[in-house]
Amino acid sequence: MQRTLGRGLWGLILAGLAFLTMMPGKAIPGELVNFKQLIPFVDLKLSGWEMAEKPSGTTMKHQHIQMSEAKASYRAGDKTLNIVVLDFLGQTMPWMAMLPQMEMESSEEMLRTIKVGDFKALENYKFKEKHGELNISVADRFWVKLEGNGLDNTEPLQAAAQQMDLKKLATLAK
């Protein structure tokens, strides 16, 4: 996180978003989705990629903190791609409301809001590091994060996101 926070506008944005996510949020009513129900959303067949780690997950309930996570890792030569689906009952999503439409590009990185299907997303790519992230808000409840290293652009992240059945994931928010 130090590497990211030390850089200009993106660092300021991340610091503000980190602050917001630490503040008590209004949880979405409903049951926490168990990680076993989230694993199919990260278990993908990606053309040109092989699975590096078998999909895994965790569900945790402790007092006022509830969270489920499913994740999987892929590789293609020196390139890596990690996919995570998180259910925090909506407590991690206030930052998406702050970014209805944003675009920033510098000599070091690109940051912009986009749509992945019907869902709001924040896309970031660091040119020198060849590191990209795609963070998607699904039904104002689930946080889908795709992160890649060794990438020439964010196209592999977008292609992987397009293979995820995000509309089906949204139905679990009920």
PLM features: residue spans?
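Short acidic, gly/pro-rich beta-turn/loop elements at beta-sheet edges
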Residues: 82-84, 93-95, 146, 156, ...
